[in-house]
Amino acid sequence: MIQVLLVTICLAALPYQGSSIMLESGKVNDYEVVYPQRLAPLPEGAVQQKYEDTMQYEFKVNGETIVLHLEKNKGLFSKDYSETHYSPDGRKITTYPSVEDHCYYHGRIENYEDSTASISACNGLKGHFKIQGETYFIESLKLSDSEAHAVLKYENVGKEDETHQICGVTLNWKSYDPIKRPSRLNLTPKQQTWPQTSVNLQLIVDHSMYAKYNSNSEKITKTVQERVNIMKEIFKPLNFDITLSGIEMWDKKDLITVKTAATDTLKLFAKWRQTDLLKRIDNDNAQLQTAVDFDGETVGLAFKSTMCDKRYSAGIIQDHSAIPLLMAVTIAHELGHNLGMDHDDTSKCNCNVCIMAPRLNTNPSKTFSDCSNNDYQKFLTDKKPKCIHKKSLKTDTVSTSVSGNEPLDDNVDGFHA
């Protein structure tokens, strides 16, 4: 029987509130310091996992006590999850780490129907939760008092240290090859019954991003996993699941030329995926993450309507923010293009700042518009992508078997940023 832990987070004294501090997510202001304390230990004789399957946390937000319910995201990793790096002489070194007792959770706030949460419990609590339309961050302060955490509104995360005009300036996904939007679909009730689909996602970290994080492989791995944990929450309303098939780090050197011209880099990366990656790692889609500053305001680029394609099921992402939520939305945007989604037209869609907005808002939404829903349904109907309709092979255990990829076709609609 799964044991539930009840933890209370008590507010610290007032002197700890209101000052500025630098966290992993950036400089923050107007935060509250809280202290997680376990109230209900496991019964005598019970075996405690390092990270329980379900947990509850109680704490105060703006003076109101709330209860955060968390459930371990057991579908986060594929059965063949792998991590790859390179030796000094260029040899691939691939390991298959145990991921059974991982530390990533989704959740909700008790008594708030529309609340959501994505939390990492790897080293204290880190993540975000949404309640009554407000997004809050929680993160360990990593002070001498190891139990201290900061709770703050998303808007209080300073953007002054973010590059590429992320502070006060929205970023856009530049469209290199504009594609005419397909006609809006009038979905019947039957069409609105979304099929369960899933994708095995492979993430590649290039050498510039590896250097940006001070060659700290463990930190990079946790950072990437946090982003995918959030992405799984984003895609849930589409009945679309994401499993992480693996992370590869180009820790010694890049295996392609990562150019500032995003179009060139995307083409090179897609070709590398086809000729190298697919021969050794089973994946339906791959996304390159890089610290290279793409030309203009572009922070991502992907092929449209190419999910499952052996050559073009790919995208590239600029590591433009230290905020996990903002990066998860960026990757979700490019993955949306792979799934047939076009940019939202604010005059026709029901959302001004949804996932597929042409410009990335620094206070991002985690919602897909009705236009994106229709585009995705049309993609499923027209393209019939086989790889995402297969039974999801999710697990949290070690496995060393790797099989080939199942391509769909070579028809490509074009680039989309």
From Swiss-Prot:
Concerning Gene3D superfamilies, the annotation shows: Collagenase (Catalytic Domain)
The UniProt keyword set, sorted, is: Disulfide bond, Hemorrhagic toxin, Hemostasis impairing toxin, Hydrolase, Metal-binding, Metalloprotease, Protease, Secreted, Signal, Toxin, Zinc, Zymogen
Where is it mostly found?
secreted
A Pfam family the protein falls into: Pep_M12B_propep
Acidic residues composition-biased segments: 407-417
Q: Does the keyword Transcription apply?
A: no
GO MF, one example: toxin activity
The UniProt entry annotates the active site at E334
**Which cysteine pairs make disulfide bonds?**
C308-C387, C349-C371, C351-C354
Question: Some GO term, biological process aspect, for this entry: which one?
Answer: proteolysis
Q: Required cofactors, per record?
A: Zn(2+)
Q: Which InterPro entries did the record assign? A: MetalloPept_cat_dom_sf (IPR024079), Peptidase_M12B (IPR001590), Peptidase_M12B_N (IPR002870), Reprolysin_adamalysin (IPR034027)
Q: Which ranges of residues are annotated as propeptide in this record?
A: 21-189, 393-417
How is the cofactor bound here? Answer: Binds 1 zinc ion per subunit.
Q: Where is it located?
A: Secreted
Among PROSITE patterns, the record links this protein to: ADAM_MEPRO, ZINC_PROTEASE
The UniProt entry's sequence similarity note says: Belongs to the venom metalloproteinase (M12B) family. P-I subfamily.
Subunit composition?
Monomer.
Function summary: This protein is an alkaline zinc metalloprotease from snake venom that possesses weak hemorrhagic activity.
Query: This protein is called what?
Result: Snake venom metalloproteinase acutolysin-C
Please give the organism: Deinagkistrodon acutus
